[in-house]
């Protein structure tokens, strides 16, 4: 007599929400904002009609109010944005500046990133901070009292990976992703490329995927190099995803879905797009951990950068 009972799959995928990860950082921010005799002021510039940008601005305002920062949203026509940024650069009452991208959705957006003063660039997108990140330079001064500012969205993903235990705390700081393979589906200059650099500089082998090709970011065999190198490969997504411990996706299209069958059993999957890049139901058959969004952690990192920059403006750097 045959046994008709079917065993249930015992695989379990844990869903981790950004709000839970952000809690610890919010408490740190509340403690550090009290170190100042005033509430640091963040100005956000909105020059597009993107609903996701509007939602991000609303979240930023809500979080600033809860913690004790000042926040002002300035809605400015695209053609007036550069002058508005320069005005904020020169306003001593403004401690931090951010722009809700995209604005022109072309190379002019990269130019606008450079218009923001490095002293107030909470997004960490100006040339000085980007160069430091790519060259793995972690401080702004020889005395190493001022940490360089990292791009807030890539930094948020790093902090999520730390929270999830992907970073190995036993290994020396700066090498804690050694032995990890990570695939990133996005190579934008704002998130995907800097994220690949950050993770590779921490010791990971990173496959960066876009519509053109797959590149490999690595510090070499045995992480011997001080900073990462980038090499073109002949690989495709289906070659690198199944060998990855972590898959990070940020495709800005409602029509894109990452193929769940390419996810290695037990892998960590993170979506940083405003669209749902993963099909949750099929993904949970493979992934060990799924982080469906990162927005609240990104805002926490934005405000972390604001505290650092405010302390630098006062020449009283704080370590946060």
From Swiss-Prot:
Pathway: One-carbon metabolism; tetrahydrofolate interconversion. This is Methylenetetrahydrofolate dehydrogenase [NAD(+)]. Its EC number is 1.5.1.15. GO terms for cellular component: cytosol; nucleus. Transmembrane segments: none annotated. It catalyses: (6R)-5,10-methylene-5,6,7,8-tetrahydrofolate + NAD(+) = (6R)-5,10-methenyltetrahydrofolate + NADH. The active site is at residue 152. Gene3D superfamilies: Leucine Dehydrogenase, chain A, domain 1, NAD(P)-binding Rossmann-like Domain. CDD domains: NAD_bind_m-THF_DH. NAD(+) binds at residues 187-188, 210-211. One of its GO terms (biological process) is tetrahydrofolate interconversion. It is found in: Cytoplasm; Nucleus. Belongs to the tetrahydrofolate dehydrogenase/cyclohydrolase family. The keyword Transcription regulation does not apply. Catalyzes oxidation of cytoplasmic one-carbon units for purine biosynthesis. The keyword Oxidoreductase applies. Homodimer. Keywords: Cytoplasm, NAD, Nucleus, One-carbon metabolism, Oxidoreductase, Purine biosynthesis. The gene is mtd1. Its main location: cytoplasm. GO terms for molecular function: methylenetetrahydrofolate dehydrogenase (NAD+) activity; methylenetetrahydrofolate dehydrogenase (NADP+) activity.
